[in-house]
Swiss-Prot record:
Residues forming the catalytic site: 194
Role summary: Catalyzes the reduction of the glycolytic intermediate dihydroxyacetone phosphate (DHAP) to sn-glycerol 3-phosphate (G3P), the key precursor for phospholipid synthesis.
Signal peptide range in chain numbering: none
Annotated catalysed reactions: sn-glycerol 3-phosphate + NAD(+) = dihydroxyacetone phosphate + NADH + H(+); sn-glycerol 3-phosphate + NADP(+) = dihydroxyacetone phosphate + NADPH + H(+)
Family listed: Belongs to the NAD-dependent glycerol-3-phosphate dehydrogenase family.
Protein name as annotated: Glycerol-3-phosphate dehydrogenase [NAD(P)+]
GO molecular function, a single term: glycerol-3-phosphate dehydrogenase [NAD(P)+] activity
EC number in record: 1.1.1.94
Alphabetized Gene3D superfamilies for the sequence: N-(1-d-carboxylethyl)-l-norvaline Dehydrogenase, domain 2, NAD(P)-binding Rossmann-like Domain
Highest taxon of source: Bacteria
Gene source species: Shewanella sediminis (strain HAW-EB3)
NCBIfam families to which the protein is assigned, alphabetical: PRK00094.1-1 (NF000939), PRK00094.1-2 (NF000940), PRK00094.1-4 (NF000942)
Length: 338
């Protein structure tokens, strides 16, 4: 089947729209699907995603589409950008509508709810072995990407030719640099764990602890990410790159991060429900914390920061209690195994 679009993006939230804007601005006809017809109608009418990215015009090559079948028939390249807790359901909806030559990439950051499985495993369970898979991950705030500010990300997947084609689609000398990576597992994990650590950094700043504590959390958070990654077969070096250290620093230090702002609200004394309401959009790290904690417990991997964030979010703990528990841990050597 011939393509009528270069790529289809599933998910018309802030990040999906930002990636679609970047692709269309790069000269590629891009279909953007969203599950709410009224939202898509507003995108068409306003030529702007006023709900998530107000003030940023949609390029002419970006075509909003409310019908999933039409969107998936338009291109064999499918970019999924939906929250991790609906990733499986969106793939299940898409499966009977996918073209035989479809190739699937996602920019979703997270693991499967309840099980803590990588999204690669979820995709294979639903779609089988037929379709090439890839993941896009790295330090990206949607608003900056949509505005054309310089951004760098990493990409990994199961098919070399698919990766090459994606790099050609995504790369822009003016706005987006794409690094190829051969660690499919590592890129998927980094995007989930960094959200958990960002919540901890926000809680620390909300309490008023300052830059020293924030930096310690980022550094030890990187240790936790690497430890868990190596336990599931990822390459430790991956976490020194865009999808590890890069995403971790970005999300922990800038208030554009919903996860960091969520943590700030908790640190200032708000309860979990009120803090989420204050953010007003999906806080991926809330679910990611449970996913990462579940995976770490299943594998017997020690992740003290993650454990304390989990206690605050799901067991009624407080940020002050979490800080006391972390500072009161037994002394040990600062090594990769500590």
């Amino acid at each position: 089947m011939k393509n009528t679009a270069d790529i289809t993006v599933l998910g018309a939230g802030s990040y999906g729209t930002a990636l679609a804007i970047s692709l269309a601005s790069n000269g590629h006809r891009t279909l953007l699907w969203g599950h709410e017809p009224e939202h898509i109608a507003n995108l068409k009418k306003d030529k702007c995603n006023n709900e998530f990215l107000p003030g940023i015009a949609l390029p002419d090559l970006l075509i909003p589409e409310a019908d999933l079948a039409t969107a998936l028939a338009a291109s064999n390249n499918v970019l999924v950008v939906v929250p991790s807790h609906v990733f499986g359901s969106v793939l299940s909806q898409a499966k009977p509508l996918l073209r035989d030559d479809a190739r699937i990439i996602w920019a979703t950051k997270g693991l499967e709810p309840e099980t803590g499985r990588l999204l690669q495993e979820v995709a294979r369970d639903i779609l089988g072995e037929h379709y090439p898979l890839a993941v896009l991950s790295g330090p990206t705030f949607a608003k900056e990407l949509a505005a054309g500010l310089p951004t760098a990300i990493s990409i990994a997947g199961t098919d070399v030719n698919f990766i090459k084609d994606l790099v050609e689609l995504l790369h822009s000398p003016k706005r987006l640099r794409v690094y190829e990576n051969d660690d499919f597992t590592g890129l998927q994990l980094g995007g989930a764990v960094k959200n958990v650590i960002a919540i901890s950094a926000g809680m620390s700043d909300g309490i008023g602890f300052g830059a020293n504590a924030r930096t310690a959390l980022i550094t030890r958070g990187l240790v936790e990410l690497t430890r868990l990654g190596e336990a599931i077969g990822a390459q430790g070096a991956t976490f020194m790159g865009m999808a590890g250290l890069g995403d971790l620093v970005l999300t922990c230090t800038d208030n554009q991060s919903r996860n960091r702002r969520f943590g700030l609200a908790l640190g200032k004394g708000l309860d979990v429900e009120t803090a989420q309401q204050e953010i007003g959009q999906v806080v991926e790290g809330y679910r990611n914390t449970k996913e990462v904690y579940t995976l770490a417990k299943r594998l017997g991997v020690e992740m003290p920061i993650t454990e304390q964030v989990y206690k605050v979010l799901y067991q009624g703990g407080t940020p002050h209690e979490a800080a006391k528990a972390l500072l009161g841990r037994d002394q040990k050597s600062e090594t990769p195994d500590s």
